[in-house]
Each structure stands twice: as structure tokens, then as C-alpha cells.
């Protein structure tokens, strides 16, 4: 894996965390009320990297977005600018909490249809994992039907990569079996797994013990390229000893959470930022380039992963 760490001075500084020793569980912070920063009228002019040469597929990914408010729209507008600047986007991918506060169908237009209208199309679908705010009130199946998606878990394929969507609201052995079956079958070199509650996190909710025991051993054994999670409203990228990259991308639009500087029990942290953002994923051959883009258009982090 080739890693490029990008630092910014002042308010956009990216904090690189120290290497942390693995242990059984990640220390968590008490539940806190999210804080919403002052929102500028419009994002600043984006400063995107040049599109990856030889790209055969790509997507944008985000989580914890579905408020229907200004910050969500600004993140979506910056995603549209990314798409219009020559970066390939074949799908929009979310790691859950797509419709606040309770996933009600009456909120689908405000939280899903309107914000992403400039990006979504028949050729550029929205593929979602369900978060707790989508599923806990019983509306998860309706959201999947609204987006013409199958029941979870499900798989999607783009050129060069397979995307596997799990329901982390019920991290059970049945899904572990499904995951093992999918990863054991012939397929692209790049396998990307998406679910809501994080395998590893250093913010309010912390790591998810049941996922760590049921799913992480499978992800590690098959050396998946990338795991995309949400639930904690910030950004962090971890890299395990098996060269699996775990990303928390909970900055899609809702209020942000502070990172716990005393966090333990995770793989080494490579980069973190308490910023609203999305991920731009570009695939070329057996490599993917992951670019983390702030709501205001700056590049917060970038890494290339090869399998």
C-alpha cells in the first residue's frame, strides 16, 4: 500500500494519530450531543486532485448525511463538483443513517432525493447500507424498496471491484456466513465492504465488539481492500496488520463528534479529521485511490490501495 498523508495548517489541519497497540475493544467516550459548526453560505472553490489515470470505475461514499439541511446539501454539491471535474463516478454509496431522525418515508424526498438530484441518474444509482436511524423504527425495508435495492445483505459489482453491503444493525452469524461465501467465490481483486456501525472507531460510539468478533476475522482472512463505515460523525482511517484499510466516514451532513485522543484497541490510525466530507474512490486495474474531500473542497487525506 502506498500512503500519502496530507497536512493542512490552521483550521483545516489534518491530525495524524500515533500507532496504537491492539487490544480487545476500543475505549469510547460518553454519548455526546453533536456540534454543528458555523456554515458558510457556499463551499469554497474546490481544489481536487487530477483524476486518476487509467480509471475504469469509481464512486463517492459518505455516511450520516440524511438531515435534509444545509450542510448535507453542501457536501452533496461538492460531490457534484467532483463528478463534473472529470472524476469517474458510477454510483453513490452510503454507510447508513440516510434519513434522520427515524427513517420515515415522509423524509425520503428531503433526505435522499433532493440533496443528490444533481448526481444521481439511472446510470449512477445510490446504493445504501442501513444505519440505526434508518432501521430502528422499522422503515428499513421501505427505504431499500424506494431505492430499488434488495434486502440486506447484498452485493454490487463495478468494473474491477465488488461492493458488499451488510446490515450492522443485526451483526449475526448468518451474515458472517454470507460474507465468507461472497469473499471465497471468484471475483475482482478489489473487495470493498460497507456497513454502518464501525469495526473500529475512536469517537463517541467507538468500535463495535460484536462486529469485531463476527466479521473482522473474515475481512482480515480475505484481506479485503477497504471497509467503509459510519455511525461516528468524523473521519478516521485505520490500517490493520493484514493490510486491510478501515474508514469511518461519518461526515456526510449531521453534527460532528470529537475524537477520543485516549482511544485504544484499534489498528494503527493513519489519518483523522473532524470535518464534514465524502470519499472519492477511483479504481484502475488492481488498485484504488481513496481521496477524502472536505465539504469545502480541500483534500484531507489520500491513499492508494493495491491488491
Q: Which stretches of residues belong to each language-model region?
A:
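Extended active-site neighborhood of metal-dependent phosphoesterases/phosphodiesterases
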Residues: 48, 87, 100-191, 203-226, ...
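N-terminal active-site segment of His-dependent metallophosphoesterases
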Residues: 36-107, 169, 174, 201-202
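Residue-level marker for buried hydrophobic side chains located in beta-strands
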Residues: 59-61, 92-94, 128-129, 193, ...
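Active-site glycine-centered loops adjacent to acidic/histidine catalytic or metal-binding residues
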Residues: 64, 96-97, 131-132, 196, ...
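A short C-terminal boundary segment appended to hydrolase-like catalytic domains
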Residues: 270-307
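Bacterial N-terminal signal peptides that target proteins for export
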Residues: 2-15
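Bacterial signal peptide processing site
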Residues: 27-29
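C-terminal motif of bacterial Sec signal peptides marking the signal peptidase cleavage site
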Residues: 22-25
Amino acid at each position: 500500500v502506498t500512503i500519502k498523508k496530507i497536512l493542512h495548517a490552521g483550521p483545516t489541519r489534518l491530525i495524524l494519530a500515533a500507532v496504537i497497540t491492539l487490544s480487545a475493544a476500543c475505549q469510547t467516550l460518553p454519548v455526546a450531543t453533536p456540534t454543528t459548526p458555523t456554515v458558510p453560505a457556499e463551499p469554497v472553490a474546490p481544489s481536487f486532485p487530477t483524476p486518476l489515470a487509467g480509471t475504469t470505475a469509481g464512486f463517492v461514499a459518505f455516511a450520516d448525511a440524511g438531515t435534509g439541511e444545509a450542510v448535507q446539501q453542501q457536501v452533496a454539491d461538492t460531490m457534484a463538483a467532483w463528478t463534473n471535474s472529470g472524476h469517474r463516478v458510477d454510483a453513490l454509496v452510503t454507510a447508513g443513517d440516510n434519513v434522520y431522525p427515524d427513517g420515515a418515508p415522509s423524509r425520503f424526498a428531503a433526505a435522499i432525493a433532493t440533496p443528490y438530484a444533481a448526481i444521481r441518474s439511472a446510470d449512477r444509482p445510490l446504493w445504501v447500507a442501513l444505519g440505526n436511524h434508518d432501521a430502528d423504527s422499522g422503515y428499513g425495508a421501505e427505504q431499500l424498496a424506494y431505492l430499488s435495492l434488495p434486502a440486506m445483505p447484498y452485493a454490487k459489482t463495478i468494473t474491477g471491484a465488488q461492493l458488499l453491503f451488510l446490515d450492522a444493525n443485526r451483526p449475526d452469524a448468518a451474515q458472517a456466513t454470507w460474507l465468507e461465501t461472497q469473499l471465497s467465490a471468484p471475483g475482482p481483486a478489489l473487495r470493498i465492504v460497507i456497513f454502518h456501525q464501525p469495526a473500529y472507531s475512536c469517537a463517541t460510539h467507538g468500535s463495535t465488539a460484536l462486529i469485531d468478533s463476527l466479521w473482522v476475522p473474515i475481512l482480515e482472512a480475505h484481506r479485503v481492500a477497504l471497509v467503509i463505515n459510519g455511525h461516528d460523525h468524523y473521519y478516521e482511517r485505520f490500517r490493520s496488520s493484514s493490510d486491510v484499510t478501515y474508514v469511518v466516514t461519518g461526515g456526510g451532513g449531521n453534527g460532528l463528534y470529537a475524537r477520543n485522543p485516549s482511544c485504544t484497541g484499534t489498528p494503527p490510525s493513519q489519518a483523522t479529521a473532524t470535518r464534514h466530507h465524502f470519499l472519492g474512490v477511483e479504481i484502475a486495474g488492481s488498485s484504488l485511490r481513496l481521496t477524502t474531500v472536505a465539504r469545502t473542497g480541500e483534500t484531507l487525506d489520500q491513499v492508494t490501495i493495491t491488491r
